Amino acid sequence: MTLLESVQSPADVKRLEHGELAKLAAEIRSFLIEKVSRTGGHLGPNLGAIELTLAVHRVFDSPRDAVVFDTGHQAYVHKIVTGRQSGFDRLRKRDGISGYPSRAESEHDLVENSHASTALSYADGLARAFQLGSEQRHVVAVVGDGALTGGMCWEALNNIAADPDRPVVIVVNDNGRSYAPTIGGLAEHLAGLRLKPGYERALESGRRTLQNLPVVGRSLYTGLHAAKSGIKDALSPQVMFSDLGIKYLGPVDGHDLRSMEQALSMAKAFGGPVIVHAVTRKGNGFAPAENDVAEQMHQVKVIDPETGIPTKPAPKIWTDVYSDELVRIGAEREDVVAITAAMLGPTGLDKFAAAYPERCYDVGIAEQHAMTSAAGMAMGGLHPVFAVYSTFLNRAFDQLLMDVALHRQPVTVTLDRSGITGDDGASHNGMWDLSILGAIPGIQVAAPRDAVTLREELREAVAVDDGPTVMRFPKGSVIEEVPAVERIGGVDVLSKPASDERSEVLLAAVGAFGQLGVAVAERLAAQGIGVTVVDPRWVVPVPQAVLDLAARHSLVVTLEDCGRHGGFGWSLAAAMRDQEIDVPLRDLAVPNRFLQHASRDEVLSDLGLTEQDIARRITEWVAGRLTPVVVGNGRGETATGA
């Protein structure tokens, strides 16, 4: 049995001698490289958090002491030492463990935090609850991968600092990066701390000297530490934290277990809020990750565990098409600028940044700021393009509504990973964007179906100069073209019955579901059911051409890869009522529930959003049986639509 196999709980880690910990860390590093190479996942961040996480579990008592990770993707080692090693064979796959903390998996996971910058607010609330209940429990917030660039962290710090007795230990896992190198004034400040370790040595020397004094040593040290303002400016560059009233320890080598344990033990003994600044290296111990200058293997597909090279050639994806077209637009229009919230590569802006570095802005994990900054740029005569994952748009809704749309500013927002993303689970599905966007007056939203329409609709979006535009597209591979047979009022007709056949059903297939809609129509044609398939192209507001076509059919069906509530079908139904178009409408979309991690195809199959299931439902509806039909594989999740 390996040392790692003997570890099934934090108590097992506590029992190990210091000499055994280095061996355990090495075994965990090999385990992560082997397992994540086979499944894909967040490899770099977790290789950099091994010793830090082991130290947390040796000093604190999870689950009695609450351990919260921010960002949640750096919690793999936490999962390993809390009894979930066997689950890594199916990491981020159906019936396997989540890539983020999961309350369903373990009592050690309090928070399913896969959106960044939230841990300190959770920690503040948990600590308040422990204080109110007179419970002697600590909260440990492990904050890393650029999360401190998010505004929520500073709102939380302001509250945590207000109570000198609040039992919160904040471990800053400072690897200098989110996906790419962390940017901004805070990043520069932390870099300065990394370069000036003298304060830690001075503080530790003073602690040892004073605590060795009989009787009064500990009290004297505590008093001097609390009143050290006269000397701290001479010794420490971390005034920002100390002036908030939060004690600071560091920088500490985050890969030195003994140093990390000492720092965490001191923080625990202090009582009250303490920051432990741990300096780590993303991808530590795996040469391919350390040598990956761009992202240090932040997130990988299936790779060779020796070389780090993907085992399969990467297909052309939606992000690639978007990235290339934005560069071409940038060459034609000097007023077009690009904004990202700490995701330059993942959102495809890396090529734009390389071509026009002075016109590309990475604002850190700060979607709210990004949106309002974009409004300001538009007021100044620029046309900003804010590239963001669909799931992170939720954070900037108020800014899009009040700062962009209310002022009718020409800002284009491009939503990558819209619809079902699959393996990252409930928090990363982009199924809420149309529900959010449909409530904003004056906004226009496009949903391309292929590479050709993505290029076309992106250009149409940046041509709008009197209000905000949005373009949504999914994760994954993209086909070059789903051809249209004609365009009517800006709406593409993708297929229709032969001239001598009657079209009974209008099938409006949104975005990437265009190809699926055509396949459904072909299947129904073989059964004698005439179907016209249209791609609305611009889904908000509802195109008049779709309404005109709806009035000429016996049944309207909408098909979309987003939430039903507030989706295109929902909006089309309202518009049909407004225009007194008395034709039945059935909307096939994602039900209003959180969806667990699985592949995109598996999730769509569960929801009945497959060619066979959709055709069967339409057949039943045409036959007059308009009651709900349970489809899918019996897991209890089905697309709504009756």
Curated annotation (Swiss-Prot):
Family annotation (HAMAP family): DXP_synth
Catalytic activity: D-glyceraldehyde 3-phosphate + pyruvate + H(+) = 1-deoxy-D-xylulose 5-phosphate + CO2
Protein name: 1-deoxy-D-xylulose-5-phosphate synthase
Organism name: Saccharopolyspora erythraea (strain ATCC 11635 / DSM 40517 / JCM 4748 / NBRC 13426 / NCIMB 8594 / NRRL 2338)
GO cellular component: cytosol
SMART domains noted in UniProt: Transket_pyr
Record keyword Magnesium present: yes
EC nos: 2.2.1.7
Similarity annotation: Belongs to the transketolase family. DXPS subfamily.
Function, in words: Catalyzes the acyloin condensation reaction between C atoms 2 and 3 of pyruvate and glyceraldehyde 3-phosphate to yield 1-deoxy-D-xylulose-5-phosphate (DXP).
Gene Ontology terms, MF aspect: 1-deoxy-D-xylulose-5-phosphate synthase activity; magnesium ion binding; thiamine pyrophosphate binding
Gene: dxs
Pfam families per the UniProt record, alphabetical: DXP_synthase_N (PF13292), Transket_pyr (PF02779), Transketolase_C (PF02780)
Subunit-structure text: Homodimer.
